[in-house]
Amino acid sequence: MNLRVALMLFLAVIMPIVRADEQSDKLKKAIAQELLKALLEDDDDEDKPKKPKAPAAPAPDAPVAAPAKKKGKEPTVAPKAPEPAPDAPFAFEAYQATPGAIYPSLVLATATIKDDGKEDDPRDATNYGDRMGILGVTLKNVRKDDKFVIEISADAVIRPSKLTFVAKASELLVTAAPKVKFDYEALGRITQTRPLNVTFKVTRNGQALDEVDEVLSLRQINDCPFALLTPTPKKNGKIVKEFHDIRFMFAAYVNENHPQIDQILKEAKATGVTKSFLGYQAGEKEVFEQVNAIWLALQRRGITYSSITNTTPVQGVNAQHVRFLDESISMTQANCVDGSVLMASVLKKIEIKACLVVVPGHCYLAFYSKEPEKGGKLYAVETTMLGSKAPLLDAINVATSQAPYSLQKNAAKFDQEDSGYMLVDLDAARDLGIMPIPYVKGLK
Protein backbone atom coordinates (compact mmCIF):
# COMPACT_ATOMS: atom_id res chain seq x y z
CA MET A 1 0.00 0.00 0.00
CA ASN A 2 1.23 3.53 -0.75
CA LEU A 3 1.83 5.70 2.29
CA ARG A 4 0.13 8.71 0.72
CA VAL A 5 1.57 11.17 3.19
CA ALA A 6 4.98 10.33 1.73
CA LEU A 7 3.96 12.07 -1.47
CA MET A 8 3.40 15.42 0.29
CA LEU A 9 6.82 16.99 -0.08
CA PHE A 10 7.65 20.58 0.63
CA LEU A 11 9.12 23.51 -1.30
CA ALA A 12 12.88 23.64 -1.85
CA VAL A 13 14.60 27.01 -2.22
CA ILE A 14 17.86 28.04 -3.88
CA MET A 15 19.66 29.69 -1.00
CA PRO A 16 21.15 33.22 -1.12
CA ILE A 17 24.82 33.92 -0.55
CA VAL A 18 25.64 35.56 2.74
CA ARG A 19 28.70 37.69 3.33
CA ALA A 20 29.71 38.89 6.76
CA ASP A 21 32.70 40.38 8.51
CA GLU A 22 34.93 38.23 10.72
CA GLN A 23 33.69 37.93 14.29
CA SER A 24 35.48 38.28 17.59
CA ASP A 25 35.69 35.32 19.90
CA LYS A 26 33.52 36.91 22.56
CA LEU A 27 30.09 38.24 21.65
CA LYS A 28 29.22 41.37 23.56
CA LYS A 29 25.85 42.98 23.21
CA ALA A 30 27.01 46.21 21.61
CA ILE A 31 29.39 44.49 19.20
CA ALA A 32 26.73 41.94 18.28
CA GLN A 33 24.26 44.66 17.38
CA GLU A 34 26.78 46.43 15.16
CA LEU A 35 27.73 43.20 13.41
CA LEU A 36 24.12 42.32 12.78
CA LYS A 37 23.62 45.75 11.28
CA ALA A 38 26.70 45.24 9.09
CA LEU A 39 25.42 41.86 7.96
CA LEU A 40 22.24 43.43 6.66
CA GLU A 41 24.09 46.27 4.92
CA ASP A 42 26.55 43.91 3.19
CA ASP A 43 23.92 41.91 1.27
CA ASP A 44 23.81 42.40 -2.52
CA ASP A 45 20.58 42.63 -4.51
CA GLU A 46 21.64 39.69 -6.66
CA ASP A 47 21.38 37.41 -3.64
CA LYS A 48 17.59 37.26 -3.66
CA PRO A 49 16.02 33.81 -3.37
CA LYS A 50 15.03 32.05 -6.54
CA LYS A 51 11.64 30.63 -7.34
CA PRO A 52 10.81 27.63 -5.13
CA LYS A 53 10.86 24.24 -6.79
CA ALA A 54 9.95 20.72 -5.82
CA PRO A 55 12.33 19.22 -3.23
CA ALA A 56 14.71 16.34 -3.65
CA ALA A 57 13.44 13.08 -2.24
CA PRO A 58 15.49 10.19 -0.82
CA ALA A 59 18.57 10.73 1.32
CA PRO A 60 21.49 8.78 -0.21
CA ASP A 61 23.14 8.25 3.15
CA ALA A 62 20.21 6.14 4.29
CA PRO A 63 20.69 2.35 4.38
CA VAL A 64 17.29 2.03 2.71
CA ALA A 65 18.11 2.97 -0.87
CA ALA A 66 15.70 4.52 -3.33
CA PRO A 67 15.26 2.48 -6.51
CA ALA A 68 16.86 3.96 -9.59
CA LYS A 69 14.52 6.04 -11.72
CA LYS A 70 13.70 4.68 -15.15
CA LYS A 71 14.10 6.88 -18.17
CA GLY A 72 11.12 7.62 -20.34
CA LYS A 73 7.54 8.47 -19.56
CA GLU A 74 5.74 6.26 -17.07
CA PRO A 75 2.38 4.92 -18.20
CA THR A 76 -0.56 6.75 -16.69
CA VAL A 77 -3.11 4.05 -17.41
CA ALA A 78 -2.59 0.45 -16.35
CA PRO A 79 -3.75 -2.44 -18.53
CA LYS A 80 -6.90 -4.24 -17.47
CA ALA A 81 -6.23 -6.01 -14.19
CA PRO A 82 -6.20 -9.80 -14.40
CA GLU A 83 -8.95 -11.62 -12.53
CA PRO A 84 -8.40 -14.58 -10.22
CA ALA A 85 -8.84 -18.07 -11.61
CA PRO A 86 -12.19 -19.69 -10.78
CA ASP A 87 -10.55 -22.16 -8.41
CA ALA A 88 -8.09 -19.69 -6.83
CA PRO A 89 -8.54 -19.78 -3.03
CA PHE A 90 -9.23 -16.61 -1.07
CA ALA A 91 -6.59 -15.58 1.47
CA PHE A 92 -5.50 -12.51 3.41
CA GLU A 93 -2.42 -11.11 5.12
CA ALA A 94 -1.86 -8.28 7.56
CA TYR A 95 0.25 -5.30 6.55
CA GLN A 96 1.78 -2.23 8.17
CA ALA A 97 2.82 0.99 6.45
CA THR A 98 5.98 0.79 8.55
CA PRO A 99 6.68 -2.94 8.26
CA GLY A 100 6.68 -4.78 11.58
CA ALA A 101 6.30 -1.64 13.66
CA ILE A 102 4.06 1.23 14.73
CA TYR A 103 5.68 4.64 15.15
CA PRO A 104 3.64 6.84 17.54
CA SER A 105 5.35 9.93 16.13
CA LEU A 106 4.07 9.15 12.62
CA VAL A 107 0.55 8.42 13.87
CA LEU A 108 0.34 11.65 15.89
CA ALA A 109 1.97 13.87 13.27
CA THR A 110 -0.30 12.75 10.42
CA ALA A 111 -3.54 12.21 12.35
CA THR A 112 -5.24 15.31 10.92
CA ILE A 113 -4.04 15.03 7.32
CA LYS A 114 -7.04 14.88 5.01
CA ASP A 115 -7.28 12.63 1.97
CA ASP A 116 -6.34 14.82 -0.99
CA GLY A 117 -8.79 12.99 -3.24
CA LYS A 118 -6.19 12.36 -5.93
CA GLU A 119 -6.28 9.12 -7.86
CA ASP A 120 -3.91 6.37 -6.82
CA ASP A 121 -1.36 5.01 -9.26
CA PRO A 122 -3.59 2.94 -11.61
CA ARG A 123 -1.13 0.06 -11.30
CA ASP A 124 -1.63 -0.16 -7.54
CA ALA A 125 -4.10 -2.62 -6.09
CA THR A 126 -7.54 -1.18 -5.35
CA ASN A 127 -7.77 0.22 -1.83
CA TYR A 128 -10.87 0.19 0.34
CA GLY A 129 -11.15 2.32 3.46
CA ASP A 130 -8.43 4.63 4.74
CA ARG A 131 -5.99 5.35 1.89
CA MET A 132 -3.49 6.70 4.44
CA GLY A 133 -3.96 3.77 6.78
CA ILE A 134 -1.11 2.71 9.03
CA LEU A 135 -2.57 -0.80 9.47
CA GLY A 136 -4.69 -2.97 7.19
CA VAL A 137 -4.94 -6.23 5.28
CA THR A 138 -4.13 -7.47 1.78
CA LEU A 139 -6.93 -9.60 0.31
CA LYS A 140 -6.07 -12.19 -2.37
CA ASN A 141 -8.40 -13.51 -5.09
CA VAL A 142 -11.34 -11.23 -4.42
CA ARG A 143 -14.58 -11.73 -6.36
CA LYS A 144 -16.97 -9.00 -7.40
CA ASP A 145 -19.75 -8.40 -4.83
CA ASP A 146 -17.85 -10.17 -2.06
CA LYS A 147 -18.90 -8.61 1.26
CA PHE A 148 -16.14 -7.94 3.75
CA VAL A 149 -15.81 -6.86 7.36
CA ILE A 150 -12.25 -5.99 8.43
CA GLU A 151 -11.53 -5.65 12.16
CA ILE A 152 -8.33 -4.60 13.91
CA SER A 153 -7.71 -4.61 17.66
CA ALA A 154 -4.73 -4.63 20.02
CA ASP A 155 -3.88 -5.14 23.68
CA ALA A 156 -3.07 -1.42 24.07
CA VAL A 157 -3.19 1.98 22.30
CA ILE A 158 -5.75 0.80 19.70
CA ARG A 159 -9.49 0.54 20.26
CA PRO A 160 -11.43 -1.99 18.12
CA SER A 161 -11.67 -0.60 14.58
CA LYS A 162 -13.86 -1.88 11.75
CA LEU A 163 -14.37 -1.42 8.00
CA THR A 164 -17.29 -2.84 5.98
CA PHE A 165 -17.35 -2.83 2.17
CA VAL A 166 -18.46 -4.70 -0.97
CA ALA A 167 -15.88 -5.52 -3.66
CA LYS A 168 -16.54 -3.56 -6.86
CA ALA A 169 -14.68 -5.99 -9.12
CA SER A 170 -12.87 -9.32 -9.19
CA GLU A 171 -9.16 -8.76 -8.54
CA LEU A 172 -6.02 -10.70 -7.65
CA LEU A 173 -5.11 -8.29 -4.84
CA VAL A 174 -6.86 -5.49 -2.96
CA THR A 175 -5.97 -3.64 0.22
CA ALA A 176 -8.37 -2.68 2.99
CA ALA A 177 -7.67 -0.39 5.93
CA PRO A 178 -10.11 0.62 8.67
CA LYS A 179 -9.77 4.09 10.16
CA VAL A 180 -7.80 2.88 13.16
CA LYS A 181 -8.96 4.30 16.50
CA PHE A 182 -5.64 5.05 18.16
CA ASP A 183 -5.40 6.19 21.77
CA TYR A 184 -3.38 9.31 20.96
CA GLU A 185 -2.70 10.24 24.57
CA ALA A 186 -1.32 6.78 25.29
CA LEU A 187 0.86 6.90 22.17
CA GLY A 188 2.40 10.17 23.34
CA ARG A 189 3.52 8.47 26.56
CA ILE A 190 5.44 5.60 24.95
CA THR A 191 9.01 6.36 26.02
CA GLN A 192 10.43 2.86 25.56
CA THR A 193 9.95 0.49 22.65
CA ARG A 194 7.76 -2.47 23.58
CA PRO A 195 5.96 -5.36 21.87
CA LEU A 196 2.30 -4.90 20.92
CA ASN A 197 -0.14 -7.71 20.12
CA VAL A 198 -2.36 -6.75 17.17
CA THR A 199 -5.21 -8.92 15.86
CA PHE A 200 -6.44 -8.73 12.26
CA LYS A 201 -9.82 -10.34 11.57
CA VAL A 202 -11.59 -10.76 8.21
CA THR A 203 -15.19 -11.83 7.62
CA ARG A 204 -16.08 -12.69 4.00
CA ASN A 205 -19.68 -13.14 2.90
CA GLY A 206 -20.72 -13.74 6.50
CA GLN A 207 -18.03 -16.33 7.18
CA ALA A 208 -15.42 -15.43 9.80
CA LEU A 209 -11.96 -16.52 8.69
CA ASP A 210 -9.01 -17.40 10.88
CA GLU A 211 -7.63 -14.41 12.74
CA VAL A 212 -4.08 -13.24 12.20
CA ASP A 213 -2.20 -12.28 15.37
CA GLU A 214 1.00 -10.32 14.94
CA VAL A 215 3.47 -8.98 17.46
CA LEU A 216 4.54 -5.54 16.30
CA SER A 217 7.24 -3.28 17.68
CA LEU A 218 5.58 -0.24 19.28
CA ARG A 219 8.32 2.35 19.01
CA GLN A 220 9.12 5.06 21.52
CA ILE A 221 7.76 8.52 20.79
CA ASN A 222 11.27 9.91 20.16
CA ASP A 223 11.81 7.57 17.20
CA CYS A 224 11.32 9.63 14.05
CA PRO A 225 11.01 7.59 10.81
CA PHE A 226 12.34 9.49 7.80
CA ALA A 227 12.59 6.86 5.03
CA LEU A 228 10.52 3.77 4.28
CA LEU A 229 10.73 0.79 1.97
CA THR A 230 7.08 -0.30 1.94
CA PRO A 231 5.61 -3.42 0.27
CA THR A 232 2.98 -2.15 -2.21
CA PRO A 233 0.43 -4.59 -3.73
CA LYS A 234 -0.20 -4.19 -7.47
CA LYS A 235 -3.17 -5.09 -9.64
CA ASN A 236 -1.10 -7.75 -11.41
CA GLY A 237 -0.89 -9.71 -8.17
CA LYS A 238 2.69 -8.77 -7.35
CA ILE A 239 3.93 -6.91 -4.28
CA VAL A 240 6.64 -4.34 -5.03
CA LYS A 241 8.79 -2.56 -2.46
CA GLU A 242 8.58 1.20 -2.94
CA PHE A 243 10.74 3.91 -1.39
CA HIS A 244 9.10 6.81 0.47
CA ASP A 245 11.02 9.86 1.67
CA ILE A 246 9.20 11.20 4.75
CA ARG A 247 11.76 13.62 6.14
CA PHE A 248 8.90 16.04 6.66
CA MET A 249 8.46 14.05 9.91
CA PHE A 250 11.20 16.14 11.54
CA ALA A 251 8.72 19.03 11.44
CA ALA A 252 6.55 17.12 13.92
CA TYR A 253 9.18 17.68 16.63
CA VAL A 254 8.99 21.45 16.16
CA ASN A 255 6.45 22.54 18.77
CA GLU A 256 5.71 26.26 18.67
CA ASN A 257 3.07 25.73 21.39
CA HIS A 258 5.41 24.19 23.95
CA PRO A 259 4.83 25.77 27.40
CA GLN A 260 8.56 26.20 28.09
CA ILE A 261 9.02 28.61 25.17
CA ASP A 262 7.74 31.55 27.23
CA GLN A 263 10.55 31.03 29.74
CA ILE A 264 13.13 30.88 26.95
CA LEU A 265 11.81 34.16 25.54
CA LYS A 266 11.95 35.72 29.00
CA GLU A 267 15.60 34.73 29.32
CA ALA A 268 16.28 35.93 25.77
CA LYS A 269 14.84 39.33 26.59
CA ALA A 270 17.03 39.47 29.70
CA THR A 271 20.14 39.37 27.50
CA GLY A 272 19.40 42.99 26.56
CA VAL A 273 19.98 42.32 22.86
CA THR A 274 16.32 42.99 22.04
CA LYS A 275 13.53 44.75 23.87
CA SER A 276 10.64 42.76 22.43
CA PHE A 277 9.75 39.86 20.15
CA LEU A 278 7.71 41.26 17.30
CA GLY A 279 8.67 38.84 14.54
CA TYR A 280 8.49 40.61 11.18
CA GLN A 281 6.61 43.62 12.54
CA ALA A 282 10.00 45.25 13.05
CA GLY A 283 12.81 45.63 10.48
CA GLU A 284 15.42 43.10 9.37
CA LYS A 285 17.95 44.38 11.90
CA GLU A 286 15.45 43.70 14.69
CA VAL A 287 14.78 40.22 13.31
CA PHE A 288 18.48 39.36 13.62
CA GLU A 289 18.52 40.82 17.12
CA GLN A 290 15.61 38.59 18.12
CA VAL A 291 17.35 35.49 16.74
CA ASN A 292 20.58 36.52 18.44
CA ALA A 293 18.85 36.99 21.80
CA ILE A 294 17.38 33.48 21.57
CA TRP A 295 20.79 32.08 20.60
CA LEU A 296 22.42 33.72 23.64
CA ALA A 297 19.69 32.52 25.99
CA LEU A 298 20.12 28.92 24.85
CA GLN A 299 23.90 29.18 25.18
CA ARG A 300 23.49 30.41 28.76
CA ARG A 301 21.41 27.31 29.41
CA GLY A 302 24.61 25.33 28.84
CA ILE A 303 23.34 23.18 25.99
CA THR A 304 26.15 21.05 24.54
CA TYR A 305 26.38 18.90 21.44
CA SER A 306 25.45 15.22 21.79
CA SER A 307 25.64 12.90 18.79
CA ILE A 308 23.20 10.25 20.06
CA THR A 309 20.85 9.51 17.15
CA ASN A 310 20.56 5.73 16.92
CA THR A 311 17.36 3.73 17.36
CA THR A 312 16.80 -0.01 17.37
CA PRO A 313 16.75 -1.01 13.67
CA VAL A 314 13.52 -1.99 11.92
CA GLN A 315 13.80 -3.65 8.51
CA GLY A 316 12.63 -1.31 5.78
CA VAL A 317 12.55 1.78 8.03
CA ASN A 318 15.18 4.44 8.66
CA ALA A 319 14.59 6.36 11.88
CA GLN A 320 16.44 8.71 14.21
CA HIS A 321 16.04 9.49 17.90
CA VAL A 322 14.92 13.12 18.27
CA ARG A 323 14.70 14.92 21.61
CA PHE A 324 11.77 17.17 22.40
CA LEU A 325 12.34 20.80 23.35
CA ASP A 326 11.98 20.19 27.10
CA GLU A 327 14.36 17.21 26.93
CA SER A 328 17.10 19.23 25.22
CA ILE A 329 16.64 21.98 27.83
CA SER A 330 16.56 19.71 30.89
CA MET A 331 19.37 17.42 29.69
CA THR A 332 21.40 20.35 28.26
CA GLN A 333 22.21 18.15 25.27
CA ALA A 334 21.25 18.36 21.61
CA ASN A 335 22.38 16.82 18.34
CA CYS A 336 21.96 18.56 14.99
CA VAL A 337 18.25 17.75 14.68
CA ASP A 338 17.52 18.44 18.36
CA GLY A 339 19.12 21.88 18.26
CA SER A 340 17.42 22.76 15.00
CA VAL A 341 13.91 21.81 16.15
CA LEU A 342 14.55 23.61 19.46
CA MET A 343 15.42 26.92 17.83
CA ALA A 344 12.80 26.48 15.13
CA SER A 345 10.12 26.03 17.81
CA VAL A 346 11.01 29.35 19.42
CA LEU A 347 11.29 31.22 16.11
CA LYS A 348 7.96 29.89 14.89
CA LYS A 349 6.39 30.99 18.19
CA ILE A 350 7.37 34.61 17.49
CA GLU A 351 6.30 34.21 13.85
CA ILE A 352 9.72 34.25 12.25
CA LYS A 353 9.51 31.85 9.31
CA ALA A 354 11.86 28.93 9.94
CA CYS A 355 12.89 25.84 7.98
CA LEU A 356 14.81 22.65 8.65
CA VAL A 357 17.61 22.03 6.18
CA VAL A 358 18.17 18.28 5.82
CA VAL A 359 21.33 17.17 4.01
CA PRO A 360 23.04 13.76 3.91
CA GLY A 361 23.91 12.88 7.49
CA HIS A 362 23.12 16.32 8.93
CA CYS A 363 20.42 18.88 9.73
CA TYR A 364 20.53 22.59 10.50
CA LEU A 365 18.22 25.57 10.86
CA ALA A 366 17.30 28.31 8.40
CA PHE A 367 15.18 31.44 8.82
CA TYR A 368 14.01 34.34 6.67
CA SER A 369 15.12 37.90 7.45
CA LYS A 370 11.63 39.06 6.47
CA GLU A 371 8.61 37.57 4.73
CA PRO A 372 9.76 35.63 1.62
CA GLU A 373 7.06 37.26 -0.49
CA LYS A 374 8.55 40.64 0.46
CA GLY A 375 12.05 39.70 -0.61
CA GLY A 376 13.22 38.10 2.61
CA LYS A 377 16.50 36.22 2.40
CA LEU A 378 17.15 32.80 3.84
CA TYR A 379 19.99 32.47 6.37
CA ALA A 380 21.21 29.20 7.83
CA VAL A 381 22.38 28.55 11.40
CA GLU A 382 24.68 25.71 12.48
CA THR A 383 22.94 24.86 15.75
CA THR A 384 25.61 22.36 16.84
CA MET A 385 27.76 25.43 17.62
CA LEU A 386 25.50 26.36 20.54
CA GLY A 387 27.73 24.46 22.93
CA SER A 388 30.94 26.05 21.65
CA LYS A 389 29.83 29.53 22.82
CA ALA A 390 30.32 30.72 19.25
CA PRO A 391 28.71 34.02 18.20
CA LEU A 392 25.53 33.69 16.19
CA LEU A 393 27.19 35.20 13.13
CA ASP A 394 29.85 32.49 13.16
CA ALA A 395 27.09 29.88 13.15
CA ILE A 396 25.38 31.73 10.28
CA ASN A 397 28.58 31.94 8.24
CA VAL A 398 29.37 28.23 8.68
CA ALA A 399 25.94 26.94 7.66
CA THR A 400 25.26 29.52 4.97
CA SER A 401 28.54 29.64 3.09
CA GLN A 402 31.57 27.99 4.71
CA ALA A 403 30.84 24.33 5.49
CA PRO A 404 30.92 21.62 2.78
CA TYR A 405 27.18 21.06 3.39
CA SER A 406 26.30 24.79 3.43
CA LEU A 407 23.47 26.46 1.54
CA GLN A 408 25.74 28.40 -0.80
CA LYS A 409 27.95 25.47 -1.78
CA ASN A 410 25.03 23.14 -2.44
CA ALA A 411 22.39 25.49 -3.83
CA ALA A 412 21.93 23.49 -7.03
CA LYS A 413 21.48 20.21 -5.16
CA PHE A 414 18.26 21.41 -3.55
CA ASP A 415 16.76 21.32 -7.05
CA GLN A 416 18.10 17.88 -7.96
CA GLU A 417 16.06 14.75 -7.40
CA ASP A 418 17.73 12.05 -5.32
CA SER A 419 20.44 14.47 -4.13
CA GLY A 420 19.55 14.01 -0.47
CA TYR A 421 19.19 17.78 0.04
CA MET A 422 15.81 19.05 1.23
CA LEU A 423 14.37 22.19 2.76
CA VAL A 424 11.48 21.37 5.10
CA ASP A 425 9.29 24.46 5.21
CA LEU A 426 7.52 24.46 8.58
CA ASP A 427 4.63 26.64 7.43
CA ALA A 428 4.05 24.29 4.50
CA ALA A 429 4.19 21.34 6.88
CA ARG A 430 1.51 22.83 9.09
CA ASP A 431 -0.63 23.69 6.06
CA LEU A 432 -0.36 20.06 4.97
CA GLY A 433 -1.58 18.90 8.36
CA ILE A 434 1.73 17.78 9.90
CA MET A 435 1.01 18.52 13.56
CA PRO A 436 3.49 19.10 16.40
CA ILE A 437 3.75 16.07 18.66
CA PRO A 438 2.00 17.33 21.81
CA TYR A 439 3.93 18.03 24.98
CA VAL A 440 3.15 15.58 27.79
CA LYS A 441 3.74 17.03 31.26
CA GLY A 442 5.84 14.89 33.55
CA LEU A 443 6.97 12.58 30.76
CA LYS A 444 10.23 10.89 31.68
Where in this protein do the model-derived segments appear?
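A structural boundary/capping signal
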Residues: 71-444
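N-terminal propeptides/low-complexity segments immediately following signal peptides
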Residues: 21-57
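Sec/Tat signal peptide C-region and signal peptidase I cleavage site
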Residues: 16-20
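Bacterial N-terminal signal peptides
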Residues: 6-14
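Acidic, proline-/serine-/threonine-rich low-complexity intrinsically disordered repeat tracts
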Residues: 45-85
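Positively charged n-region of N-terminal signal peptides that target proteins for export
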Residues: 1-5
